Swiss-Prot record:
Name of the protein in question: NAD(P)H-quinone oxidoreductase subunit H, chloroplastic
EC primary class: translocase
Originating species: Aethionema cordifolium (Lebanon stonecress)
Membrane topology: Peripheral membrane protein
Family recorded in the similarity comment: Belongs to the complex I 49 kDa subunit family.
Key words of the record: Chloroplast, Membrane, NAD, NADP, Plastid, Plastoquinone, Quinone, Thylakoid, Translocase, Transport
Principal subcellular localization: plastid
Compartment(s) of residence: Plastid, Chloroplast thylakoid membrane
Length: 401
């Protein structure tokens, strides 16, 4: 009887671009030696739509609906970066009330993004039950978005100089109720997931990334903070009004997939702290209060002029002044950035004294973070690829643009 010949040559496997664990249309060409990964080549570009070139042929107000299609799970951040650039170029001041509402929306969007990362990440490594609990909480966030903006996703809420509309009746109370509820659910996640021995076996020590290596690769966000680097643009740049709130940078030093999970879980708790402080300190309070005071002001026109002027203050508005659709970008260049859920989202903007930007360069965090994938999966097992890729947290709309 002849024995079968054992083949010792390498095997090449195509994963994607429609594999459910790819989180979009990503293709991986993986070279295997048995079950060990020798090499991995990501193939990008399946979702490229020419977002940068479109920006150069649109006014900013026309381009705003497009930007929500980059990272379509954290659209508030793409809107924020789109209006921040023209605001800085035109020296446009944003009312404090609008800035507070922006922070609330950004942090809710961060929570929604992290939740939508956590559910599929757990499903990737074989845990189906948390997926349904996590999507239940995500629905509450989307209900808040729908009440405030009219849209569950693709909100189109930010405007140059402020926001599109003030918060509706009862929204603040509803949001505070959600914050109290969600903090208890995060504790449940920790009991259900963090101490699970099967989960720890899949993520602990998998995809280890050192701090110096993370800096050299230009990584940002939870990928960087999970490697021991305390870097958060909300603390560094102090954009909007983040410097007025008390919160801490969440970081870990192990640099593995577990550390990246812990950073994101802790960030959701910190986001709730920021939202609660912003809701309690919102200039003018709920919209109902502002409207009632405005009505009282009209009814009592003979009241003290100082009291009248107090509630007509610039800081109580939701937008400074609506710019013209032909708003011109001054002839200078500027780089603006925000701390998105996946890392540093930036735009390099060049104006040329016209309504259209001369150059609109997008720096997507997912695209930069994905470059480290081949290094992280080498010498790992084939099954670990999904764990490592999931821990990076990519959205292909943002990667390919």
């Amino acid at each position: 009887m002849n024995r079968p010949v054992t083949r010792k040559d390498l095997m090449i496997v195509n994963i994607g671009p429609h594999h459910p664990s790819m989180h979009g249309v990503l293709r991986l060409i993986v070279t295997l030696d048995g079950g060990d990964v020798v090499d991995c080549e990501p193939i990008l570009g399946y979702l490229h739509r020419g977002m940068e070139k479109i920006a150069e042929n649109r006014a900013i107000i026309q381009y705003l609906p497009y930007v929500t299609r980059w990272d379509y799970l954290a659209t508030m951040f793409t809107e924020a970066i789109t209006v921040n650039g023209p605001e800085q170029l035109g020296n446009i001041q944003v009312p404090k009330r609008a800035s507070y509402i922006r922070v609330i929306m950004l942090e809710l969007s961060r929570i929604a993004s992290h939740l939508l990362w956590l559910g599929p990440f757990m499903a990737d490594i074989g845990a189906q039950t948390p997926f349904f609990y996590i999507f239940r909480e995500r629905e509450f966030v989307y209900d808040l978005f729908e009440a405030a903006t009219g849209m569950r996703m693709m909100h189109n809420f930010f405007r140059i100089g402020g926001i599109a509309a003030d918060l509706p009746y009862g929204w603040i109370d509803k949001c505070l109720d959600f914050c109290d509820y969600f903090l208890t659910e995060v504790v449940e996640y920790q009991k259900l997931i963090t101490r699970n021995p099967i989960f720890l076996e899949r993520v602990e020590g998998v995809g280890i990334l050192g701090g110096e290596e993370a800096i050299n690769w230009g990584l940002s966000g939870p990928m960087l903070r999970a490697s021991g680097i305390q870097w958060d643009l909300r603390k560094v740049d102090r954009y909007e009004c983040y410097d007025e709130f008390e919160w801490e940078i969440q970081w870990q030093k192990q640099g593995d997939s577990l550390a990246r999970y812990l950073v994101r879980l802790s960030e959701m708790t910190e986001s709730i702290k920021i939202i609660q402080q912003a809701l309690e300190g919102l200039p003018g309070g709920p919209y109902e209060n502002l409207e009632r005071r405005g009505f009282d002001r009209k009814m009592n026109s003979e009241m003290n002029s100082e009291m009248n002027s107090e509630w007509n203050n610039f800081d109580y508005r939701f937008i400074s002044k609506k710019p013209s659709p032909t708003f011109e970008l001054s002839k200078q260049e500027l780089y603006v950035r925000v701390e998105a859920p996946k890392g540093e989202l930036g735009i390099f903007l060049i104006g040329d004294q016209s309504g259209f930007p001369w150059r609109w360069k997008i720096r997507p965090p997912g695209f930069i973070n994905l470059q480290i994938l081949p290094e992280l999966v080498k010498r790992m097992k084939l099954a670990d690829i999904m764990t490592i890729l999931g821990s990076i947290d990519i959205i292909m709309g943002e990667v390919d643009r």
